[in-house]
């Protein structure tokens, strides 16, 4: 009976240590989450750090090699996400996987954005592409760039929205 007590006590101490370690880990992650700026994977970020380039962009060809763009919407309470992007016919576009995305709702309310391509941060305005032929052309360009997706069904394509990203 004496050895059972010490094993029970040891198990309680180990469980207490695990609980403390878990609480510290969760607390640390919470602090990082609250103080983030850039988005991380699917977790949205806040205000993108850095000074934005304010000059109007005339030549968007520098975006051709970009695999993605980080876009910040809602200037009053910045909300940033990583999205796919493409260069098509001299213009720069981003892709939303759904019009229902929170960031898209913010963009519709206020088209003023900040966006980062590579290491540079820019001021811009974004508008949702409505022209059906242009949307079809953008899907073709997207399929070439990312090597896939050309076989999307019309129902799948209907969920996506392209945004034209321009200078402010």
Identify the function of each model-found stretch:
Residues 32-79:
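Short, conserved active-site entrance elements at the starts or edges of catalytic domains
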Residues 63-98, 113, 125:
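Short beta-strand segments
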Residues 48-51, 63-65, 72, 92-94, ...:
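A short linear-motif detector with a strong N-terminal bias
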Residues 12-14:
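Feature marks short, highly hydrophobic, charge-poor N-terminal signal-anchor/signal peptide-like helices
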Residues 16-32:
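Hydrophobic membrane-insertion alpha-helices, especially the h-region
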Residues 38, 45-46, 56-57, 100-168:
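Short, structured beta-strand-loop surface elements
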Residues 1-9:
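N-terminal amphipathic/basic-hydrophobic helices that include classical n-h-c signal peptides
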């Amino acid at each position: 009976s004496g050895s059972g007590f010490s094993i029970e006590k040891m198990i309680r101490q180990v469980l207490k240590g695990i609980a403390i370690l878990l609480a510290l880990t969760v607390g640390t992650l919470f602090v990082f989450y609250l103080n983030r700026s850039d988005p991380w994977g699917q977790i949205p970020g806040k205000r993108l750090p850095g000074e934005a380039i304010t000059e109007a962009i005339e030549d968007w060809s520098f975006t051709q090699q970009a695999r993605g763009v980080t876009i910040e919407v809602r200037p009053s309470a910045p909300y940033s996400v990583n999205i796919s992007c493409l260069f098509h016919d001299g213009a720069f576009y981003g892709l939303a996987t759904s019009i229902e995305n929170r960031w898209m709702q913010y963009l519709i309310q206020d088209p003023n954005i900040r966006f980062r391509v590579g290491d540079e941060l820019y001021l811009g305005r974004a508008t949702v592409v409505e022209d059906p032929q242009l949307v079809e052309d953008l899907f073709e360009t997207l399929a070439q760039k990312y090597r896939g997706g050309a076989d999307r069904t019309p129902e799948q394509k209907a969920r996506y929205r392209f945004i034209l990203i321009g200078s402010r």
